[in-house]
Amino acid sequence: MPTRSLPTFLTLLLLASIDWVSKLVVLLKSCQLSPHSSAFLYSYVWGHFSFLIIPSFNEGAAFGLFTQYKIPLLIFRVCVILGLALFLRIKYKSLHRRTRVALTLILAGALGNVGDILLYGKVVDFLSLSYYSWRFPSFNLADAFISIGTLLLIGHLYFTKESKKYF
């Protein structure tokens, strides 16, 4: 591995590790709850906005879709990870820094969630946001990394000419 891409690789491992550790902490803390305590580990309420840390599991894709296709989903996820990693590796020098950051975030999130599937058979979600009666589906840090990376990538490709190099 060239030394130029080493910081990207280490960042990828660090972010995936932060995701895994956060999930492990939530799972361990949730095991310590007594049966008579509330189900959430942390809550913050500000007006009509609330933030909860409450463990839940997702056996499908985003928002619990495709739960009946566990093996094909896992194969698809692994193929996406390998494809993105290969693209990042081959095109590293020619990619803009923002594109590398975006792809690193997406890969770290994907690795975090695939690690869950391999360890637990499902993805561990624990972050919950709501406003009034509207509740956003539970998510985790890996999901946040993927979302932020995707938004960065779309924004960068939309507002620059770099997209013409690849598409």
Swiss-Prot record:
The keyword Cytoplasm does not apply. The chain crosses the membrane at residues 8-28, 46-66, 68-88, 101-121, 139-159. The keyword Cell membrane applies. It comes from the Bacteria. InterPro entries: Peptidase_A8. It holds the Pfam family Peptidase_A8. Its EC number is 3.4.23.36. GO terms for molecular function: aspartic-type endopeptidase activity; endopeptidase activity. The active site is at residues 125, 143. Pathway: Protein modification; lipoprotein biosynthesis (signal peptide cleavage). It is a multi-pass membrane protein. GO terms for cellular component: plasma membrane. It catalyses: Release of signal peptides from bacterial membrane prolipoproteins. Hydrolyzes -Xaa-Yaa-Zaa-|-(S,diacylglyceryl)Cys-, in which Xaa is hydrophobic (preferably Leu), and Yaa (Ala or Ser) and Zaa (Gly or Ala) have small, neutral side chains. Keywords: Aspartyl protease, Cell inner membrane, Cell membrane, Hydrolase, Membrane, Protease, Transmembrane, Transmembrane helix. It is found in: Cell inner membrane. Its main location: membrane. It is an enzyme of class 3 (hydrolase). GO terms for biological process: proteolysis. Belongs to the peptidase A8 family. NCBIfam families: lspA. This protein specifically catalyzes the removal of signal peptides from prolipoproteins. This is Lipoprotein signal peptidase.
